[in-house]
């Protein structure tokens, strides 16, 4: 393996927009990474997630034309 070609691996502080910060290791030389969301404020991890059921093409079809019953489909 060649020496001197790999970037230096340094301790890095990750700062979130919510104020939470944690330390990890990275090759980023500044030593600081700023992110918008983290596991402390992301809705998926906090349990405040809104589930949007936009339906789909099948739901739209069933809404327009009604759901077919199985007996009619077998004929």
From Swiss-Prot:
<feature type="binding site">
    <location>
        <position position="16"/>
    </location>
    <ligand>
        <name>Zn(2+)</name>
    </ligand>
</feature>
<dbReference type="InterPro" id="IPR042105">
    <property type="entry name" value="Ribosomal_bL31_sf"/>
</dbReference>
<keyword id="KW-0689">Ribosomal protein</keyword>
<dbReference type="InterPro" id="IPR002150">
    <property type="entry name" value="Ribosomal_bL31"/>
</dbReference>
<dbReference type="InterPro" id="IPR027491">
    <property type="entry name" value="Ribosomal_bL31_A"/>
</dbReference>
<dbReference type="InterPro" id="IPR034704">
    <property type="entry name" value="Ribosomal_bL28/bL31-like_sf"/>
</dbReference>
<comment type="similarity">
    <text>Belongs to the bacterial ribosomal protein bL31 family. Type A subfamily.</text>
</comment>
<comment type="subunit">
    <text>Part of the 50S ribosomal subunit.</text>
</comment>
<dbReference type="GO" id="GO:0003735">
    <property type="term" value="F:structural constituent of ribosome"/>
</dbReference>
<protein>
    <recommendedName>
        <fullName>Large ribosomal subunit protein bL31</fullName>
    </recommendedName>
</protein>
<dbReference type="GO" id="GO:0019843">
    <property type="term" value="F:rRNA binding"/>
</dbReference>
<dbReference type="GO" id="GO:0006412">
    <property type="term" value="P:translation"/>
</dbReference>
<feature type="binding site">
    <location>
        <position position="18"/>
    </location>
    <ligand>
        <name>Zn(2+)</name>
    </ligand>
</feature>
<dbReference type="GO" id="GO:1990904">
    <property type="term" value="C:ribonucleoprotein complex"/>
</dbReference>
<feature type="binding site">
    <location>
        <position position="41"/>
    </location>
    <ligand>
        <name>Zn(2+)</name>
    </ligand>
</feature>
<keyword id="KW-0694">RNA-binding</keyword>
<comment type="function">
    <text>Binds the 23S rRNA.</text>
</comment>
<dbReference type="Pfam" id="PF01197">
    <property type="entry name" value="Ribosomal_L31"/>
</dbReference>
<feature type="binding site">
    <location>
        <position position="38"/>
    </location>
    <ligand>
        <name>Zn(2+)</name>
    </ligand>
</feature>
<keyword id="KW-0687">Ribonucleoprotein</keyword>
<keyword id="KW-0479">Metal-binding</keyword>
<dbReference type="GO" id="GO:0046872">
    <property type="term" value="F:metal ion binding"/>
</dbReference>
<dbReference type="GO" id="GO:0005840">
    <property type="term" value="C:ribosome"/>
</dbReference>
<keyword id="KW-0862">Zinc</keyword>
<keyword id="KW-0699">rRNA-binding</keyword>
């Amino acid at each position: 393996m060649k020496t001197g070609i790999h970037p230096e691996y340094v301790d890095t502080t990750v700062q979130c927009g919510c104020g939470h910060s944690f330390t990890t290791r990275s090759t980023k030389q500044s030593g600081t990474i700023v992110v918008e969301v983290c596991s402390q404020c992301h809705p998926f991890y906090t349990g405040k997630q809104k589930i949007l059921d936009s339906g789909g093409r099948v739901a739209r079809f069933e809404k327009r034309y009604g759901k077919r019953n199985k007996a009619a489909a077998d004929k």
